[in-house]
Design a protein with these regions (language model features):
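Outer-membrane beta-barrel translocator/channel fold
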Residues: 70-71, 108-142, 186-246, 314-356
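Transmembrane beta-strands of outer-membrane beta-barrel pores
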Residues: 61-67, 107-111, 150-152, 159-165, ...
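Membrane-embedded beta-strand positions of outer-membrane beta-barrel proteins
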Residues: 57-61, 103-105, 157, 187-191, ...
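Residues on the lipid-exposed face of transmembrane beta-strands in outer-membrane beta-barrel proteins
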Residues: 89-93, 144-148, 174-178, 221-225, ...
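Solvent-exposed loop/turn segments connecting transmembrane beta-strands
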Residues: 81, 136-138, 161-171, 259, ...
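Outer-membrane beta-barrel translocator domains and adjoining extracellular loop/strand segments
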Residues: 68-76, 114-120, 160, 167-175, ...
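Outer-envelope beta-barrel architecture signal
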Residues: 51-57, 87, 97-101, 140, ...
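Outer-membrane beta-barrel "beta-signal"
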Residues: 389-404
Length: 404
């Protein structure tokens, strides 16, 4: 789980931590960061070396709904795409003066159809053959985190296990943060390892894989620095290596390398504006991998304090270069090939807002709404236009209870 850094008050708010599961299941991979967010514990102002001051219990529900695919690009199959319901329950509590323990339980239920492969229509334009609307999947993840706090920092160990109809994953993670002598700077590091096992289920789509494994290791190092009474900046570098089965067994033309290296550089800036009683939040991320893909993400948010609540509208832009082996219509004569739109060149814009409302001293209501839109022409990289790019809506409601 994420820990607030010294001087975090200048940020006015704190985003949820990313899931401690380093290699999400195929169901969650398609969602990206939005639904990989797990609870942000103890969201009040805190220092990296401060244990939680109270017990926190939270319940959150998220609904994710993809727009139907344009009938003009469908050769065969249903036009409805995925709907996913995510329910999260968590509890974190102090244990003694220097420890805390947290339990996370998450359930995801998915229904709908997805692209099976891309072929040529009668006029030669690319068209999509869909899987049919009969896909259903349910995933349950349970995670436990224990954390130790000392005078200048903290360290935590997390273990998680997730299971669904065709996928099982176990992950172990370690993280630590420590402060400089003047508490103006905080260093953070984390390491994680996961073992995933895939057992594809036979259905409407023929599957030619019985059982495959995937191992993933990931490391991160970052630093945050208080720049002034009202400003803080951070920078971080992460590296991830996955080895094993990385193709998508539910796609007809998909043969990917059995190794995938990823490198990302992230930076952020928070400035509290006293006169406005709000903070400006700017985040940037550069990503590159061994498949030839690289991407840029920029997010700008405005966290506005209101009477009894905090409202944070945000705008995010994403652009991606296509993988070396991507083709709008896959070239099956090549060693590696894929027509998965997620490996294509495109751009995406996200508009959203988060609203946290205090309901008395012990309760907080969380609301969030987001619209995600993609287009091949919105990206800055050249490449073929995949016909199955996805747009979606996402809505979240949550309630948090804190008590001594």
């Amino acid at each position: 789980m994420a820990q607030a850094q010294p001087g975090a008050a200048v940020a006015a708010t704190k985003l949820p931590a990313l899931s401690h599961l380093p290699n999400p299941s195929p169901l969650m991979k398609r969602l990206g960061a939005p639904l990989l967010a797990l609870p942000a514990y103890q969201t009040g102002t805190a220092f990296a070396d401060a244990p939680p001051a109270f017990t926190e219990v939270g319940l959150r529900y998220t609904h994710y709904s993809e727009d139907s695919i344009d009938q003009d690009v469908v050769i065969f199959g249903a036009t409805d795409r995925y709907d996913i319901d995510v329910t999260q329950l968590w509890i974190e509590a102090p244990v003694g003066a220097s420890w805390s323990v947290a339990l996370d339980v998450q359930n995801d239920y998915q229904t709908g159809a997805s692209p099976w492969f891309v072929g040529a229509q009668q006029d030669g334009a690319p068209g999509v053959i869909m899987s049919g609307a009969s896909i259903q999947d349910n995933r349950v993840e349970v995670g436990v985190t224990t954390r130790y706090f000392w005078a200048d920092g903290n360290a935590g160990v997390a273990v998680s296990h997730s299971d669904e109809d065709d996928y099982e994953a176990t992950a172990l993670a370690f993280d630590a943060s420590w402060n400089s002598a003047d508490d103006a700077r905080t260093w953070s590091t984390s390491f994680s390892s996961s073992r995933d096992t895939l057992n594809p289920t036979q259905g409407v789509i023929p599957v030619f894989v019985t059982e495959e494994d995937l191992d993933t290791q990931s490391g991160y190092f970052g630093v945050s620095q208080i720049l002034s009474r009202t400003a803080i900046a951070r920078i971080g570098l992460s590296y991830t290596l996955s080895e094993g089965y990385l193709s998508d067994p539910y796609k007809f033309r998909d043969q990917r390398p059995d190794s995938h290296e990823r490198l990302s550089l992230s930076a952020g800036y928070r400035r509290f504006l006293i006169d406005s009683d709000a903070s400006l939040q700017i985040d940037y991320r550069y990503y590159a991998d061994s498949w030839g893909t690289d991407s840029h993400t920029v997010e700008v948010a405005w966290a506005q304090n209101l009477p009894g609540s905090l409202l944070t509208p945000y705008l995010r832009y994403y652009t991606q270069r296509e993988a070396d082996f991507f083709g709008v219509i896959a070239d099956t004569d090549a060693q590696y090939y894929a027509d998965d739109y997620r490996l294509s060149s495109y751009g995406a814009v996200t508009l959203g807002a988060r609203w946290a409302v205090d309901l008395g001293e012990s309760w907080t209501l969380e609301l969030e709404a987001e619209r995600y839109m993609t287009d091949a022409d919105w990206g800055v990289f050249d490449g073929g236009a995949a016909p199955a790019l996805v747009d979606f809506w996402r809505g979240t409601v949550g309630i948090i209870w804190r008590f001594d």
